[in-house]
């Protein structure tokens, strides 16, 4: 009997076999003995671990795999030929429980010979390796103990659903308990919850999921509330943030206003419509400065809820509109992070308050510490501090220009030049206090103690200005005495002594000697640079020159030399008192040779009067008048030693001597030169009409 297997129950093609089966179907089904025997093997077949192992052959270890493969393949609707390959070729004995009801079944259908032949064939199939009957596979599909159930379809399929080995694509047993839906009880918060949503019954109030929530208090099915908080420092408020469609919508904690701009952006509204709606709001707060998610137009809570309901985004923005939104933030699952955020917010507030209160005290303490700083680093300290600090520690600013008391005549603080140490900024500040420190003990120069020569100060006549850099001390000591009558400040007293006299070979000093005050320590240039020479040409009544420490060494030398030459007929070098110190050190040649080059360089740097005679105002007329008081003839001077100011106004230049043609003369002498009278004749040689306008201007 060949049959075509299919997914449904296989058909029996022999019509003479169907009739007897149909006549005895109810008899077999309603027999109590058959039912009791059917249920007993079923319970045993469901649990193969309870099967007696003695019924299996020890030589066939593949019995379970083959049985499972046969039952599995029939359940899945596979044809017999395909499943036959899964069976073990070695025959093996079948369990005895599958044949224990065979005698009763044969007695019930003994009137039908064909039925009696079919049933043994089904059970002898594994032993005889005859797999040609599709009916046998369907019988075994129902169960290993039911052979005729294919003819009785009234039995439910639940009796054979659970198979112990659901392999090879078999379906898992059906689960009778349904999947849990949204519950009405607030669950224990857990970060590992596998539910689709974390219901919040405390805020949902058992609202039906099918209706649209217009209050914003109920969580939509399947949505988990996500709230973040940030501290808005500019506004001083905590903001709750809910993200929807990639847009962060914020709500303030203090007044519960909501960022309407971000709210309408979630709705996908165009910019023009959004701005028009927000501009029409009566109560709004425009924020243009701050984080991007906080910028926009903030509107009240009620208006924001109305916009959300109109745009159908209320559920999308959950839990933005929940009244007690802070409770969601304070949920136990977020307690750690929430406490950290709130603690940071409180800490910032406390720091701001404490900072405002402690600010004056910080400023006061800062000012209290200022006097303790060394005067070498604070250039505007009073002179008293400068003298006191100098007594113990040499400072680079206060005594940098004060030379050491040794023969090397080098600046005290090494690489720092006197030009930087003795800045002219301190002149005006310190010269007002000059007289306060001239007669007191604070005016003593502490250098005599530092350099270990306390007895090197001889008693000399008071000097006019003793504020000289290191290289000019020995040279200009006498010259400064010649300028005493022009000093504006009083120099009398022991404090006017030259502090440079304790060089090697110095005379014994008096015990009452008082060195000069600190004002002489601020000479800007040490070696008579061009800048100081130019200032030396300015008159004594200049603001910067009227002070005793404003005179430059080279400038004073030139001015005083010209004044003293009226009574002397010597050469360029003055008398020995001008260049010889009281201790006998003759320093004239060094000073003279040094000033030669300085004055010559300054002549090239000093601006000359231009073609216009008005530029003569650049020179100081009073200085020239003082220079011209002398009647010394011009040939007596050396061109290399005389400044150009004396050349320009010398009376010897009235005839323009030819001995000075190699020098660049000022424009004033060129303008009055007799070699230019031919200029007007040049214009008369041409017709006036043909002369250009620029040439006519010369006439």
Swiss-Prot record:
Query: Which residues are in the HTH APSES-type domain?
Result: 226-332
> Keyword Nucleotide-binding on this protein?
no
As one GO molecular function, the record gives: DNA-binding transcription factor activity
Ranges for region Nuclear localization domain: 669-695
Its subcellular locations are: Nucleus
Write down the Gene3D superfamilies for this protein, in alphabetical order.
Answer: Transcription regulator HTH, APSES-type DNA-binding domain
Q: Which residues bind DNA?
A: 260-281
Phenotype reported upon loss of the gene: Does not develop perithecia and sexual ascospores, and lacks conidiophores and phialides. Greatly reduces pathogenicity on wheat heads and production of secondary metabolites such as deoxynivalenol (DON) and 15-acetyldeoxynivalenol (15ADON). Leads to up-regulation of cell-cycle genes which promoters are highly enriched in StuA-response elements (StRE).
* Keyword tags: Conidiation, DNA-binding, Nucleus, Sporulation, Transcription, Transcription regulation, Virulence
Skewed-composition ranges (Low complexity): 32-49
Biological process terms from the Gene Ontology for this record are: conidium formation; positive regulation of transcription by RNA polymerase II; sporulation resulting in formation of a cellular spore
Q: Where is the composition biased (Basic and acidic residues)?
A: 428-438, 478-491, 535-545
Disordered: annotated segments: 1-20, 31-97, 372-594, 599-618, 674-699
Compositional bias annotation for Acidic residues: 75-84
| Pfam families the record matches | KilA-N
Tell me which PANTHER family the record gives. PROTEIN SOK2-RELATED
| Similarity comment | Belongs to the EFG1/PHD1/stuA family.
Q: What does this protein do?
A: Transcription factor that regulates asexual reproduction. Binds the StuA-response elements (StRE) with the consensus sequence 5'-(A/T)CGCG(T/A)N(A/C)-3' at the promoters of target genes. Controls the expression of the gene clusters involved in the production of deoxynivalenol (DON) and 15-acetyldeoxynivalenol (15ADON). Regulates the expression of genes involved in chitin and glucan metabolism. Also controls catalase activity and cell surface hydrophobicity. Plays an important role in pathogenicity.
Name-wise, this protein is Cell pattern formation-associated protein StuA
Q: Which organism is this entry from?
A: Gibberella zeae (strain ATCC MYA-4620 / CBS 123657 / FGSC 9075 / NRRL 31084 / PH-1)
**Phylogenetic classification of the source organism:** Eukaryota, Fungi, Dikarya, Ascomycota, Pezizomycotina
Gene encoding the protein: StuA
